[in-house]
């Protein structure tokens, strides 16, 4: 960003010395400048009034001279009165000379007073320029500070990127540890499957033993006298059945609660997925709104810049038109002055014109040398600007190539993001039955809410910035309108003043023409009286006039050649200025394009960082989801194995219960049969005592067998319970270990997420600070451009005022030359009057005449002239 300062010099040379004025680019001193210009205009108006008064007095003096000449003509008859009249005329002429000297002194005093005021104004302007330079140095220091802050922020961003890389490395290490833990979990799953296989084998052995027991029970069908013992066994089995039914009911209730919890988790996961989709839609909408605001603001800024450029072009066209009109008026004035100079037939005026022409030629030569120097400087500036333009174009091409690379990377990242989103959707569909996803979803929802709040804050900030930009734009438009109104007023005033000046010039020209005609009449009369002397003098002066005309023609030719050279140089300067403006405009456009490309690069970089962050978060969520999926699968497998075992136990118990119920029915039937048989046998007891003894022996044998079988059944049941307890304890330990490991991993994940959130917050703060600094630099750049535009407008106004001052000085110099010329004409007229008086005295000495008048009755007046001529023999 290059700072540009402009300084304009104005030099005017007068009788007292050179006056140099420096105009600086201070917006705050506009009002002071306008007040000073008003004071200068008032001084100029007072000087004009003084000069008008001098011209009136001069016209009065010319009238008095004409009256004196008339009196001289009337007083030719009386010599005594002529002497008195000559004395009176001498006194009047001395008075007139004193008056002219006083007027000249007053005009010099007023000019000296104006120069003093001008020098004071110049001193004040120089003080203002010093203040402006100090303010400019302060602004440059602040800009350097801002640049240093920007560099520090960039260094901080690089440090955050390095920290991000280290965090990625730690995440990769954690992923490796998670992979090792997964391998361990798979090994534990294998051990669990082996335990389940052993359990199934034991259950098969248990079933075989139960079959043997059933066969033994079938062998007990023939026992009829075990009613009481079997009843006790039935009661025991009933109690066991009731206990098992209670256990089954508790297991069914726990299964029902688990199913209800799983269904609620499914519903919550579906709601969270819907909420996440809604949050993503809101994010997309917010991004679209931000992009729309951004595009709208950029289009409005571009339109405003186009309007400002159009206004600048229109102002430049109007200024060029006014300059052409002024040049045409100046050419007209110069033509009028040339015509007047051709009409002037006196030698002294021609000599003065020659001196002026030589001085003007010298000034023009100096100006030509200055213009050549300016031309060389402008050419060097144009070459430097072309070099800068080429450098900026190269940088722009490099930036465009970098932007294309970033866009290509951004598209790749977008494709990866789409693929990850698809995988994420699949994982979300697969993880519909996981418990841990609920906490993750709640945390994500909270993070999304924070991001939504942040986006809303950014949107509010953007809206506030947009409103501020709108207010600034309105203020600038009001300033432009006010400046255009002031320009229109100034233009109207200067047009009115130009018209007044033209009218004054026309009136002066008419007066001078009348005076010239009167003088020509008087000269013609004097020439009629003094032909001989005038013829001699005429011949002498005609030769001088021809010589002077030749020299004047040569000077005019030189002047015309110099004016042509000056016009050519002015055309070249205007072309170079236009080329310079065009190059400067192209440079400005390149700088704007470079700033826009930098902003786009920054936006793309920010989007790329966001996409990287989103990719990392998606990868983390994917890994967490995979872990939770594996854990849930392991838990589901465990639950399925437990359910299978419970179902097998349930089926086993149901089969045992059905077998026991069948045994109970059979025993009930057998009891009835036994009762009948007992009733029969009671009758036949006596006859069957021998059979009873045998049966008692058999009964003792059966009881011994029964006791041995009961002992074996009890041992088997104890072994079964021990195996089931060992299996359940081992599964619970494994589950407890896995749950503890899952909790540790979740805690580590939460810590990593917190760290990541903190780093993201720091990055967002740094990005926000960088954006604020960029906005401040852009606003400073805009204010600098606005100040430059205002300075250019002020410079144009100052140029117009300079031209007016130059014109006023030229007019004052012309009026002074006219006064001097009229003084010379008066002196020449006095000399001629003296010569005429001497001639009259000679004529009167030669011829004496008496004038007698007589009144004839009837109203006629008779004049008798008697002449007496004296001749010397």
Swiss-Prot record:
Tissue: Expressed in all tissues except in saliva.
Sorted UniProt keywords: Coiled coil, Cytoplasm, Motor protein, Muscle protein, Myosin, Thick filament
Protein origin, superkingdom: Eukaryota
Subcellular location, record wording: Cytoplasm, Myofibril
GO terms under cellular component: bicellular tight junction; myofibril; myosin complex; myosin filament
Entry keyword annotation includes NADP: no
InterPro entries: Myosin_tail, XRCC4-like_C
Segments forming a coiled coil: 26-852
Region feature (Nonhelical region): 1-25, 853-873
Role summary: Paramyosin is a major structural component of many thick filaments isolated from invertebrate muscles.
Subunit structure of this chain's protein: Homodimer. Binds IgG and collagen.
PANTHER family: CINGULIN-LIKE PROTEIN 1-RELATED, MYOSIN TAIL DOMAIN-CONTAINING PROTEIN
Family recorded in the similarity comment: Belongs to the paramyosin family.
Protein name: Paramyosin
Species name: Rhipicephalus microplus
């Amino acid at each position: 960003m290059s700072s540009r300062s402009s300084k304009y010099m104005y030099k005017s040379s007068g009788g007292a010395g050179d006056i140099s004025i420096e105009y600086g680019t201070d917006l705050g001193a506009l009002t002071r400048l306008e007040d000073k210009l008003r004071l200068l205009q008032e001084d100029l108006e007072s000087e004009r009034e003084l000069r008008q008064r001098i011209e009136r007095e001069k016209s009065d003096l010319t009238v008095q001279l004409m009256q004196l000449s008339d009196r001289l003509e009337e007083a030719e008859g009386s010599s005594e009165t002529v002497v008195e009249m000559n004395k009176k005329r001498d006194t009047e002429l001395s008075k007139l000379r004193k008056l002219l000297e006083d007027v000249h002194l007053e005009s010099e005093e007023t000019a000296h007073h104006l120069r003093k005021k001008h020098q004071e104004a110049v001193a004040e302007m120089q003080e203002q320029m010093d203040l402006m330079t100090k303010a400019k140095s302060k602004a440059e220091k602040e800009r350097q500070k801002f640049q240093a802050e920007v560099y520090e922020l960039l260094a901080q961003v690089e440090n955050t990127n390095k920290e991000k890389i280290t965090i990625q490395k730690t995440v990769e290490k954690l992923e490796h540890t998670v992979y090792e833990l997964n391998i361990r979990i798979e090994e534990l799953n294998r051990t669990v499957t082996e335990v389940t296989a052993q359990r199934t084998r034991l259950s098969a052995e248990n079933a075989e033993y139960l079959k043997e027991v059933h066969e033994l029970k079938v062998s007990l069908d023939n026992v009829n006298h075990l009613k009481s013992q079997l009843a006790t066994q039935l009661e025991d089995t009933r109690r066991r059945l009731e206990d098992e039914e209670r256990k089954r009911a508790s297991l069914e209730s726990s299964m029902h609660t688990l199913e209800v919890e799983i269904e609620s988790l499914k519903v919550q996961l579906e709601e969270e997925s819907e909420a996440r989709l809604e949050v993503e839609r809101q994010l997309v909408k917010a991004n679209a709104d931000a992009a729309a605001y951004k595009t709208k603001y950029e289009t409005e800024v571009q339109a405003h810049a186009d309007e400002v450029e159009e206004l600048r072009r229109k102002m430049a066209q109007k200024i060029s038109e006014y300059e052409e009109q002024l040049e045409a008026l100046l050419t007209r004035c110069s033509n009028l002055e040339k015509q007047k100079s051709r009409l002037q037939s006196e030698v002294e005026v021609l000599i003065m014109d020659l001196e002026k022409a030589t001085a003007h030629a010298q000034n023009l030569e100096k100006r030509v040398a200055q213009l050549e120097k300016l031309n060389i400087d402008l050419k060097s500036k144009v070459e430097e600007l072309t070099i800068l333009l080429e450098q900026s174009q190269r940088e722009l091409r490099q930036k465009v190539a970098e932007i294309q690379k970033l866009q290509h990377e951004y598209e790749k990242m977008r494709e990866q993001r789409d693929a990850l989103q698809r995988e994420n959707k699949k994982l979300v569909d697969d993880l519909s039955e996981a418990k841990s996803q609920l906490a993750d979803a709640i945390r994500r929802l909270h993070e999304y809410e924070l991001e939504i709040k942040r986006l809303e804050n950014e949107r509010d900030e953007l809206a506030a910035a947009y409103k501020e930009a709108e207010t600034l734009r309105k203020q600038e438009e009001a300033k432009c309108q006010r400046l255009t109104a002031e320009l229109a007023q100034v233009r109207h005033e200067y047009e009115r003043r130009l018209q007044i000046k033209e009218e004054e010039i026309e009136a002066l020209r008419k007066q001078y023409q009348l005076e010239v005609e009167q003088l020509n009449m008087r000269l013609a009369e004097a020439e009629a009286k003094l032909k001989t002397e005038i013829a001699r003098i005429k011949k002498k002066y005609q030769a001088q006039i021809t010589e002077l005309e030749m020299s004047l023609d040569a000077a005019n030719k030189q002047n015309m050649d110099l004016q042509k050279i000056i016009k050519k140089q002015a055309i070249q300067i205007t072309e170079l200025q236009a080329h310079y403006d065009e190059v400067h405009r192209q440079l400005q456009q390149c700088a704007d394009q470079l700033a826009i490309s930098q902003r786009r690069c920054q936006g793309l970089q920010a989007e790329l960082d966001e996409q990287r962050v989103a990719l990392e978060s998606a990868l983390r969520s994917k890994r967490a989801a995979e872990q939770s999926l594996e854990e849930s699968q392991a838990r589901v497998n465990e639950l399925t194995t437990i359910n299978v075992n419970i179902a097998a136990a349930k089926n086993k118990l149901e089969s045992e219960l059905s077998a026991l119920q069948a045994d109970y029915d059979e025993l009930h039937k057998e009891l009835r049969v036994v009762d009948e048989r007992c009733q029969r046998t009671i009758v036949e007891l006596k006859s069957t005592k021998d059979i009873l003894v045998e049966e008692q022996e058999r009964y003792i044998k059966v009881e011994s067998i029964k006791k041995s079988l009961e002992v074996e059944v009890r041992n088997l049941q104890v072994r079964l319970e021990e195996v089931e307890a060992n299996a359940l304890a081992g599964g619970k330990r494994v589950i407890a270990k896995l749950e503890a490991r899952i909790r540790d991993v979740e805690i580590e994940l939460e810590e990593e997420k917190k760290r990541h959130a903190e780093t993201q917050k720091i990055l967002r703060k740094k990005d926000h600070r960088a954006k604020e600094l960029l906005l401040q630099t852009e606003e400073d750049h805009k204010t600098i451009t606005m100040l430059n535009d205002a300075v250019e407008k002020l410079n144009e106004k100052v140029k117009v005022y300079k031209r007016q001052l130059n014109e006023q000085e030229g007019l004052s110099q012309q009026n002074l030359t006219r006064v001097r010329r009229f003084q010379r004409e008066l002196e020449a007229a006095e000399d001629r009057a003296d010569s005429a008086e001497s001639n009259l005295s000679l004529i009167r000495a030669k011829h004496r005449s008496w004038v007698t008048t007589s009144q004839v009755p009837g109203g006629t007046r008779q004049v008798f002239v008697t002449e007496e001529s004296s001749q010397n023999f």
